[in-house]
Amino acid sequence: MTVLLGMLLREVKKAGKIYMLNGITDDVSKALTRNNFLPYFLGGTTLTDNYNNTIQFYCGDARDDSSLNKYLDEQVFRNNHWNDVTSNQQEQEKISSAIHELALNVSEHSTVNEVLCCGQYYPTLHKLSFALADNGISIPANITTNKHLFDVSPDSNLINWATLRGTSTKAEPASGLGLYSIKSKLTSSGGLTIISRNGYWRKASNIENGAVTMFDLDNSPLKGTFIHFSLDMNTQVTNNVNNTNPQSIFF
């Protein structure tokens, strides 16, 4: 939710428009202040997160590895809840690699270099939720521009094509490992969701049979691409949690 809203506000800001937020509850306002979203867009200072569950909102240059590394290290891997989710070094390296591959895709394919990130820890559920997005050329638009055979395909099908092994819009022989590699890394123990232009695509975790759900949204194209993943180390608990948990809006 936070990253999607951030995508919209960045577009409004680039257009030179004035924006304000009205009608949000006090709890939501505090949550969006703790994760640095409201201070980033409206100014002011952040609130202290006494439980340290929040992965703060980040908006930066996808090409700036040092800043992105610092953000991930401080907000994700040095968080005291990281070991509540997983103490597996391979899991940490896998997530870090996947996030950096996503950022690389932003700079290579979307024609913009700005990447937005935010997340939330749910330590009692052994769960991490993280979202990343850009406001550049969408995945479907990028594919139809470079692969003209797909001009009339639904956007969700185009996203699915982009996640398959060996598919790419780049000419290099070594390309085509981007979203497939990311999907393989992130769905071993969690779900992966991609929304781009009119397409919605989600792959459940391999533990939950790895089923793919995809459909097209009606008359609500999203400029750019939004990607969310969850790392669920205790699926028996998380599967019994109501999906309408209000905390889930905060990332």
Which residue ranges define each predicted feature?
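Helix-loop-beta hinge of the Bergerat
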Residues: I55-T86, P140, K147-G166
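Conserved helix-loop functional segments at active or binding sites
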Residues: R78, W82, L104, E108, ...
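A glycine-rich helix N-cap at a beta->alpha junction
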Residues: L38-Q56
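Flexible, glycine-/charge-rich segments associated with ATP-binding catalytic modules
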Residues: L42, L149-D151, L164-F251
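Amphipathic alpha-helical interaction surfaces in cytosolic regulatory modules
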Residues: M1-F41
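Conserved ATP-binding N-box helix of the HATPase_c
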Residues: G6-L8, Q89-T124, K183-K185
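ATP-lid-like helix-loop hinge signature
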Residues: A103-N146, M214
